[in-house]
A protein has these predicted regions:
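Short beta->alpha junction loops
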Residues: 1-7
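Caspase-like (clan CD) cysteine peptidase catalytic core
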Residues: 7-34, 38-96, 143
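Active-site-proximal C-terminal subdomain of hydrolase catalytic domains
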Residues: 2, 79-145
Length: 145
C-alpha cells in the first residue's frame, strides 16, 4: 500500500492474518513500513502513523505492540518486519511531529514467536532521509543490490 490510511493498514493486517491462518503454519510473512512513528507521551509506547493521522495523538495510529501480536497470532514459518521510521517524536523533514521529544524504551517482552524485526532506529534515535534517492537511508540500503 502506498500512503495507507489507518483503515487500510488495519485491513491489510487482517488480510495477513487470514493468509497466515489459511496456510496452516507454512506462511512466510514480510511486512514493510516507511513513514512516521510516534511515542505516546504517557505510556512511551510506539505507534506507526498512517497518512490520515495528524500526529497530535499517537493513539490514533497503529500500536506496534498490537501489530506484533497480530502478526504472531497464527503459526507461520517466519515473520520478518522492516520499519523505516523513528519514534523519537521528530520527523525527517521537521514537520508537525518535530516539536515532540519523548524517549521510548523498547519492550522486548511484547515480541513472541518466530518474528524478526529490523528497524531504522530505536528509542530516541532519528531515522535519516536519503533525499537524493527519495527514500530513508534504511530503505535505500535495504533495497540496494
Amino acid at each position: 500500500m502506498l500512503d495507507a490510511t489507518t483503515g487500510q493498514m488495519n485491513q491489510g493486517i487482517s488480510k495477513i492474518n487470514l493468509i497466515a491462518k489459511s496456510t496452516k503454519g507454512n506462511a512466510e510473512l514480510f511486512v514493510y513500513f516507511a513513514g512516521h512513528g510516534l511515542p505516546d507521551e504517557q505510556t512511551k509506547e510506539a505507534y506507526l502513523m498512517p497518512v490520515d493521522v495528524n500526529g497530535k495523538n499517537a493513539k490514533d495510529g497503529i500500536k506496534l505492540a498490537n501489530l506484533y501480536s497480530k502478526l504472531t497470532e497464527f503459526q507461520t514459518k517466519n515473520v520478518s518486519v522492516f520499519i523505516d521510521a523513528c519514534f523519537s517524536g521528530g520527523a525527517r523533514n521537521q514537520s508537525l511531529l518535530a516539536a515532540r521529544g519523548v524517549k521510548i524504551q523498547p519492550k522486548e517482552d511484547i515480541i513472541k514467536g518466530n518474528i524478526v524485526i529490523f528497524t531504522a532506529s530505536s528509542g530516541a534515535q532519528s531515522s535519516l532521509p536519503y533525499k537524493e534517492k527519495n527514500h530513508g537511508l534504511f530503505t535505500y540500503y535495504l533495497l540496494k543490490k
